[in-house]
Amino acid sequence: MSSRIGGHMAATGRNCYRSAMCTVVILRRPGHNWPILIGANRDEMAGRSWERPGRHWPERENVVAGIDLLAGGTWMGLNDEGVVACILNRRDSLGPDPDLRSRGEIVLEALDHADADDAAQALSGLDGRSYRSFNLIVADNRDAFWLSSRGRVDEG
């Protein structure tokens, strides 16, 4: 399920409960010199091995992101076309599940697209049951989308 995030607004991961959660705040200002400002905190499993943002994937030379050394994906990144994507876990879905795919793959799949609209359309058909539950933000200088592995997402 996906929803377009409205114009001049800040959006946050709304499912921040009492357990450790990643947080992202996005300020979209279409037409501004800095159309997207992002603040993020990755606090799920702080001891999990990772490397700082870089071009870690030879098959995705246009992607800059931190890399999760356990599963090989990322929690947040951007591509040379200006698409940014980040994943947020949901309540009761902390950590990996050996029977499911890594949510970090979804961010990389979003960054395979030249704009946020194409990414959101491509990912809207994902089978959420293949992953632990998540919220995904995909944005560029024109659009921003919130995709969820569960149910309907209200527009921001």
What is each residue range found by the language model?
Residues M1-A20:
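N-terminal amphipathic/basic-hydrophobic helices that include classical n-h-c signal peptides
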